[in-house]
C-alpha cells in the first residue's frame, strides 16, 4: 500500500514505504508530489466537461441515430463516438470527488479499475474513431464516384466494433494491476516496461493518428479548392472546418502525449538512476495531471465540430424545437377542426420547411456525408 502522509504544503508521498516490508520494495521508492497545485484546475475542467459534454453528446447521439436509421455511413462512427463520450462522462463525477478529496479513493479497488479503464479506453477510442471519420470523409469527397459502391453501414459498424475491441484489449491489463487502498491510478514509478508502453502510446495513439488527420483533411480541402462549382465562402468554410479538426486534436491530445514521451525519454537518459527519475517525475506531476485532464475537453469539442456545428444539425434542432412547441401548444389548447384546417399550411411551413437555395424544390436535406456532389460538399463537411 502507498503511504499517504501530507504536509501543510499539500505534498503527498507516492510510492511504497518501509511500513509494509512485505512488498519487498525499499523505502527509497518514494516520490513527493503536490496534489494541491492542480486540484482547482482539475475540478473546474472536469466539472465543465461534465456539465457541457452531457447535453452535447446526448443531443449528438440522438441526431446521429436518426441519420443511422436513414442508412448514413458516417453517422455510424459519430454515433459510436457519442456513446463512448457519454459512458466516460458518466464517470467524471467520481474523478471530481477523488481529486477534491485529496486523491483518496473510497469506493473500493474494483470501482477504481473500472473507472480508470473507461477513462483510458475513451481517449484512444475517440482518437481512432476520429481517424475513421476523417478517412470516411476523405473517401467520400476525394474519391466520390469510386467509393459510392464501397461505403456501407455494415463496414462502418464492423470497423467501429474492431476499434472498440482493440482498445479494450490493449487496456485490459488495468484489471490485473494492484490498486492501493486509498489511491486510484496515480503515476507509477518509471521502469523499462512502462517507458516502452509510453513510447507505443505516443507513436500509435497520437503521432500516427495525427498524420492521418492532417493528410485526410488536407486532401479534402485540396479537392474542394479545385472545384469550380463552389463559392469562395463555401471553400473557406471547408478550410476552417479542416483546420478546426486538426487544431482541436492537437490542443487536446498533444500536451499529454508529449509528456508521456518526455517521461520515457528521461528514463532512457538517466539510465536507471531512480532517484533522478523520481525527482524529474515529481516536477512533471502537476503538468502531467493537467494535460491528462485537458485531453477530456475533446468530449465537448467533438460533438460541436462534427455534428452540432453543421447547418443540417442546426436545422434539425430547430425543427425538433418547433415541433415540441407545437406539441406543447396542442396539449394545453384545444382548437376547433375548422381552426386547425385554417392554420395547418402555416404550421407545416413553420415546422418542417427549411428553404435552402442550394436545393431544388422538394428535395430532401443532405445527410451527414452521404451525398458527395460538389454542390453539397460544404454542407457535409461543415
UniProtKB/Swiss-Prot annotation:
Residues 66-76, 136-155, 222-241, 310-382 are cytoplasmic. Keywords: Cell membrane, Disulfide bond, G-protein coupled receptor, Glycoprotein, Membrane, Receptor, Transducer, Transmembrane, Transmembrane helix. Residues 1-42, 100-113, 176-198, 262-286 are extracellular. One of its GO terms (biological process) is negative regulation of G2/M transition of mitotic cell cycle. One of its GO terms (molecular function) is G protein-coupled receptor activity. Its main location: membrane. Highly expressed in hematopoietic tissues rich in lymphocytes like spleen and thymus. Weakly expressed in heart and lung. Highly expressed in infiltrating macrophages within atherosclerotic lesions. Disulfide bonds join 112-184. GO terms for cellular component: plasma membrane. Glycans are attached at residue 11. The chain crosses the membrane at residues 43-65, 77-99, 114-135, 156-175, 199-221, 242-261, 287-309. Signal peptide: none annotated. It holds the Pfam family 7tm_1. Belongs to the G-protein coupled receptor 1 family. May be a receptor for oxidized free fatty acids derived from linoleic and arachidonic acids such as 9-hydroxyoctadecadienoic acid (9-HODE). Activates a G alpha protein, most likely G alpha(q). May be involved in apoptosis. Functions at the G2/M checkpoint to delay mitosis. May function as a sensor that monitors the oxidative states and mediates appropriate cellular responses such as secretion of paracrine signals and attenuation of proliferation. May mediate ths accumulation of intracellular inositol phosphates at acidic pH through proton-sensing activity. This is Probable G-protein coupled receptor 132. It comes from Mus musculus (Mouse).
